[in-house]
Amino acid sequence: MSLVKLQSRLEHTLPNGRLEVLPVPGYRAIKLALINADFSAGPLPQAVMNAVIEKPAYWAFCWGSGIALARYLRTHKEIVSGLRVLDLGSGSGIVAIAACLNEARLVVACDTDPDARLAIEVNAAINSVSVVTTGNAS
């Protein structure tokens, strides 16, 4: 999958954002394409704020809850090993990727946002794992 295409999707919402492939804090075996660490935390111009509200690029951030669950799977591999896993609201795909790395038989990452699904595909490729993506869990 294309990191260039994902970068373009990020710039649609955050024109000054850029993706960096970095190891996840606390689970360095996983690398994710995330928004640059030095991205401004200051106020955004009104047009950018409107774009963020309309189509947030939440998939460009690795949420603490995702890191915590990925780390939990690493230390409790038996929860996913040999099983089928469905990751709902997958975002960046960290939990789906952790399930793959901990020997899940099949991992499906579900997110309603097509940009998040692209991020999951890109991040799975970065980590050399296979994740099925879908926008519908039914």
Regions found by a protein language model. Give the residues of each.
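Conserved SAM-binding loop and adjacent beta-strand
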Residues: 56-74
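N-terminal auxiliary segments of SAM/dcSAM-dependent transferases
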Residues: 1-41
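Domain-scale activation on soluble regions of proteins
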Residues: 8-9, 45, 88, 112
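Conserved SAM/SAH cofactor-binding pocket of Class I
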Residues: 70-137
